[in-house]
């Protein structure tokens, strides 16, 4: 049995475990699903292998599913140099959902060509990091158990109240450890 602890998640922007996911839920005037912290040692396979690492999720999911990963942007907005998007990552061949997530990207940390590609939103950030040879550090801040709500259920094809696993991750510049992205990544039942 996995151990988890409840988090106090009342519409608190920049919550260390749910931001930027909470921003999209707040904008849609929808209550966040039940989200609890879980120790990485208690995450079952294959979720542990997919979440507990310091790599980008795009390449990790591509390797696991033996397919290229595509991006479907559900919502997006920009506030000066901060670009937010709510996304679904899909396998290319079957268009099967392999991740639901929310990301805040600090555009000014990227070269102009990469910035343009990020905002065009035709590829996942992980793919763009590789395409533009951008070095980064990936540092998961915590691991999550999410009780699937109707919204996530529709996206990830799971029943309400199903237990899903995810992580809260931050990407940093390797030289000065300045943040380049904040991410919540939620995996479907595999």
Locate the predicted segments by residue.
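N-terminal domain-onset segments
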Residues: 2-84, 88, 95-165, 172-190
